[in-house]
A protein has these predicted regions:
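Residue-level preference for beta-strand/loop junctions
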Residues: 1-3, 48-50
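Short, low-order "capping/linker" segments at domain edges
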Residues: 92-100
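Short, surface-exposed ligand-recognition loops at beta-strand->loop->(often short) alpha-helix junctions
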Residues: 10-22
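An amphipathic, aromatic/His-enriched active-site/gating alpha helix that lines ligand/cofactor pockets
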Residues: 24-39, 57-92
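Residue-level signal for secondary-structure boundary sites
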Residues: 15, 62-64, 97
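Active-site-flanking beta-strand signature of metal-NTP-handling nucleotidyl enzymes
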Residues: 3-10
């Protein structure tokens, strides 16, 4: 059963440009190489919620866990952490529509 890796974070102040360059040039291509399919990206405009939410699809829970245990995932995540704060994630059964 397909699952969705839902990640949330806030962009670190004064790192917006570097963050966007990293996401477009390294993070998205990197997660695609690992086997995750970008499904959605949301930005919070109002309220006390994470600034960014991203959804990635994996074939199943074991695939998601294998990807997240890989060295390549760790490297992408560590680089992401230089640009963001308050990172969180969860793996849930994928369904249509917005999931939080």
């Amino acid at each position: 059963m397909p699952v969705k890796l839902i990640m949330t974070w806030d962009i670190a102040p004064d790192h917006e440009q570097d963050y966007f360059e990293f996401v477009v040039s390294e993070f998205i291509p990197g997660i695609q190489r690992l086997g995750l399919e970008p499904a959605e990206a949301w930005a919070t405009i109002y309220g006390d919620y994470p600034q960014i939410q991203v959804g990635m699809l994996a074939a199943d829970t074991s695939s998601a866990k294998r990807i997240m245990a890989s060295q390549d995932w760790s490297q992408l995540q560590e680089k992401l952490f230089t640009f963001v704060a308050n990172f969180g994630y969860k793996v849930v059964p994928a369904r249509g529509g917005f999931q939080f």
